[in-house]
Amino acid sequence: MTDIRILLVDDEPDIREVVDVSLGLDREFATRACASGADALVTAAEWSPSLILLDVMMPLMDGPTTLANLRKNPRTAHIPVVFLTARTQASEVEQYISLGAQGVLSKPFDPMTLAASVRSYLPPATASHAP
C-alpha cells in the first residue's frame, strides 16, 4: 500500500534511479521523478507529494529557486522540501533552512538507509503510517 508520495527532483539520471529503487523497496512509498525545477513545479501542483527531495545544483532553475517558487504557490507551499546535495557545509545548510527547507540529505547517501532518512522529515501524520 502506497501512502507516502515522494517527488524527487534531480538532473542526474543515476541519482533518480538510485532513489527510485531505494524507496521502491518500501511499499509505503510512491515516487515520481523530475529532471528540472520547472517540471517539479508542475508535478508538485498536480500530484501533491508528501515530501520533495530537491537537488541544489541544477541547470536553468536551481534548487533554491525551485523552492522559492514552490513556496509562492498555495497548492505547493505546505509541502516539506529536503535538499539532496553534496554541498553540506554548515553555512550552506543554514542557508537552505533559512530558505524554507526542512533539512538536507547529503550526497552521496546510503541507499539502504534512505527510506529511514526520508521518513524522519515527514510530517507526523504522514510518518505515522510507517511500521
Language model: regions and residue ranges:
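Short, glycine/charged-rich "phosphate-handling" switch motifs in NTP-dependent
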Residues: Q102
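Receiver (REC) domain active-site loop signature in two-component systems and cognate sites
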Residues: M58
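C-terminal output helix
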Residues: F109-V118
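Short, conserved "switch-loop" micro-motifs in signal-transduction and mechanochemical regulators
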Residues: R87-T88
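Acidic, metal-coordinating helix/loop segments flanking the phosphotransfer/catalytic sites
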Residues: A33-L51
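Two-component/phosphorelay signaling modules centered on CheY-like receiver
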Residues: P13-R32
